[in-house]
Amino acid sequence: SVTVQNNATLATVDVMVASFIPFIADQLDVAADEVSFDDGRFRADGSNQTPDLLEAAAMARIEGREDLLKHTATATLDARSFPNGAHIAEMEIDPQTGVVECVKYTVTDDFGNLVHPMLVEGQIHGGIAQGLGQAVTERVVYDEDGQLLTASFMDYAMPRADNMPMVKFTNEVIPTTTNPMGMKGCGEAGTVGALAAVTNGVLDAVWEHGIHRVDMPMTPNRVWQMLSQHAVAAE
């Protein structure tokens, strides 16, 4: 989890920097209180040398300071952070075939500060695909002898690119105060939200026809039978 690993890393970096400052001061021939660490580099007034951590580690290795190359720290989170968001899936059903299609998907999340926004958006897209697959296409079938019949991707319908709608994603950043980085994490937010949004979108479409329960996966055959039993005709 980003909230645990990154804050532990940050605590370790603080220990590392504090350990390196006296060494860097000796290397630059300045007093330790003249050395600062800013934007990934050590700096000192009156010196044009600004080694980063990797360069500082190389200098320490040359000088035989192996003690500067290994650091540990403990980070304790006094409270938890909780991401939250809203997912909206616009669903369409073909009554003649039972095919369920997600035509548009909108999601707004609050994950706090992000380390890599593009990767977060990709993770949300992938999670939505997983949730859509579980809700609509993925079905496990066994025969009467317990033999798995959907044992390959020829038979087990994983979601594909053409199953995915256009996804509009926004992240409303409200940094948490429970950790120094202000991060809440995103984890499986895409999957968890998609399952409910897609299923409830289908349920909303058929509710007025007297269908008050739908079961996953909502395969064409299952949906067609459900609609036929309630005499839902094409509109």
Where in the sequence are the language-model features?
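Cofactor-binding beta-sheet edge motifs in enzyme active sites
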Residues: 1-235
